[in-house]
Each structure stands twice: as structure tokens, then as C-alpha cells.
Amino acid sequence: MALETFVNSEPFTFGVELEIQVVNTHNYDLTKAASDLMRLIQGETFPGNITPEITESMIELSTGICHTHEQALGELHAIRDVLVKAADQLNVGLAGGGTHAFQQWSDRQIYDAPRFQYLSELYGYLAKQFTVFGQHVHIGCPDPDSALFLLHSMSRFIPHFIALSASSPFVQNVDTGFHSARLNSVFAFPLSGRAPFALTWHDFEEYFTKMVNTGVVNSMKDFYWDIRPKPGYGTIEVRVMDTPLSVDRAAAIACYIQTLARYLLIDRPLTLTEDDYLVYTFNRFEACRFGLEGTCVNPQTGERRTIAEDILDTLDRIAPHAAELGSRAALDEIGALAKARVNDASWLRTVFKQEKSLNETVRQQCLRWRE
């Protein structure tokens, strides 16, 4: 199969996708209600889209093409409200968070759709274990070479996105010690990690053709990279974030990525080399394990600083672009998180410490989602 033609899109437009937990209101375990939710929202009017995901305990919402923080926030609130109304009719709850705190993966039921059934047959139990919940952000790119430049430039900031969105400290009744345990599930897949270092679309097409010829992949969907190009949309897709506990946080993170993209493509502050990836896995691990307190290493200078410090420095550098995009309010929220060095994982641990119950913690997650 040939690689899709890259459809040039309006630079720095963006879209947000959020995978949501569907839980019962008895003990707040995951429940099988995605099909019923899809049935109830038929005929409802809302921006963007709502689609099923790989198991019956997940559902995905996505915005349309957004230009500003205000637009994204409005669309996310509108879609969220439609889903909450349907969930209330079914007496089920909805929650953000990258993992469910105590669900047992073996209880999951694969959603009845051809691609999901194919993935279940291919990956076995990994497909059910993949009941984890992420935020994806698409960024519009003017041409395919710019998309690849942005992809590799953005890779240096992957620890920021992980630490800011981290909301998965608990897995199967255990505090994992991680801020984002979700990404450990993603790493189990053979085509995860980072994209190959190709800076021209011609080189990327050659790589894709070789992979197709091996029989390992059929389409871009088979790559689970942290950032991947989406030729049919004319975007790059940043895929490392946990689903935050609120749509407000999701919008702020999306606009941080949008503003950073404008800075990277217009100012071109980075000279890209494959050596940029020498510390990629280390920095990624630090963000997953320690959140905003984690260490990140500059691959060119060797300088070490906390991820929170690196975010605050980055916010200063991209401030002029925030003014152009109307994203100052979003970046103020990001700055406040970095200064306080807290994220949703911190909040979840605080609730559990107070309540001594993961069931109650998930109940409060559901309340956060409605705010």
C-alpha cells in the first residue's frame, strides 16, 4: 500500500482527541457501555465527533479544526456536555485519567468493529491491556517537509507533554510510583517509540515503502510512535499525553503544543541531528516516572535541569507567539503547573491519601470531568 499524499493544511490549526473512561456508578469500575452511549447520542448536534474505541469501556471525543484556545475550549465543553447527558441517562460515569485505578484488564470486551477485532487477534492480551486513555493533538503543517521538521523539533519537548498531562499513577490497585504509567503499556507494542530520523518527505516515503515491503505494516495506523505524521489531515499528531482529568487542562496542553509549533517552525531555533535522540528515552522515562520533578538533558549541550524549569524557560521563549495565537491564558495555566510542580497524578494521589479508597478516588475523577 502506498503512503497517502500529504494534504497541505493551514499552519498551526489544531485538533484535540480525548479517550475517556466509562465507569459504573456502583463501585466505579470500568463498565461496558460505549455502544449504548453511541446509540444515545445519535441525532444530537455538537461540534467535532464522538467515536467508539478498542474496548466497550472507552469512548473518544474529538474537536473540529481549531484556531484558538477559546474555540477549542468551547468545542470540548460542548462535546463533553453531550456525553455527560447521555451517560446520566444510562447511570454510568465518565472520567479522564490515563489509566483506570483498579480495573482488571482480563475483564475488558473488545468493541465489535473490524479493525479492533483485527488488533485483538494480532496482539492478543495486549489489546485488552491497552485499555488506557490518551490525549492526541494534531497540528496543521503547510507542507510535508515542514511536518517532518516540526515532528523532530517537537520530539525534544516530549517530556513536557508527558509531565504536564500525567494522570495515571495507579494500575490494578497499585500505586506504580510513576506519574504516567500509561505509556508503559504503549511501549509494549513493536512499532512504538520514536519516528525514524527522516527530514524530507521523499526519505520518509522510502522508509514507509520498505516497511510495507517487509509485510510488517499496511498503513500509518500501524505505527504507534510518540509523534507521527498524518498525511490525510496534513498534520503531525502528538500522542504521548495521558487524558487529563478536565477538558480545560486538555485545551491548555493543546495550546501549549500549538504555540510551541509556531515558535519551532517560524523561528527555527533548532539544528536537527540524529544525535538529538541520544537522550530521548532517558528524558521520556524521567517524565513518566517523576513528572515535573523529572530531569531532562539537553542533547546538544548536556545541560541537566528539571522538566518544570525547562517548561518555564520555554514559556518565556514562546511568549511572542502566544500573543499572536491568543493562547496567553492557556500558557498561564501551564506556567502555574510548572511553578507548583503538580499535575493530575499529584491530585489523584492526594485524593487517595485522604480517602483511603480507589473507588472514591475514581468517583471524584468523574466529578472533575463534569467541571
From Swiss-Prot:
GO molecular function terms attached to this record: ATP binding; glutamate-cysteine ligase activity
Keyword Acetylation: no
Keywords for this protein: ATP-binding, Ligase, Nucleotide-binding
One GO biological process term: modified amino acid biosynthetic process
Disulfide bond entries: none
EC number, as in UniProt: 6.3.2.2
Stored InterPro entries: GCL_type2/YbdK_subfam (IPR050141), GCS2 (IPR006336), Gln_synth/guanido_kin_cat_dom (IPR014746), YbdK (IPR011793)
Catalytic activity: L-cysteine + L-glutamate + ATP = gamma-L-glutamyl-L-cysteine + ADP + phosphate + H(+)
Statement: the UniProt record of this protein carries the keyword Mitochondrion: no
Functional description taken from the UniProt entry: ATP-dependent carboxylate-amine ligase which exhibits weak glutamate--cysteine ligase activity.
Family (UniProt): Belongs to the glutamate--cysteine ligase type 2 family. YbdK subfamily.
Stated name of the protein: Putative glutamate--cysteine ligase 2
Organism of origin: Burkholderia multivorans (strain ATCC 17616 / 249)
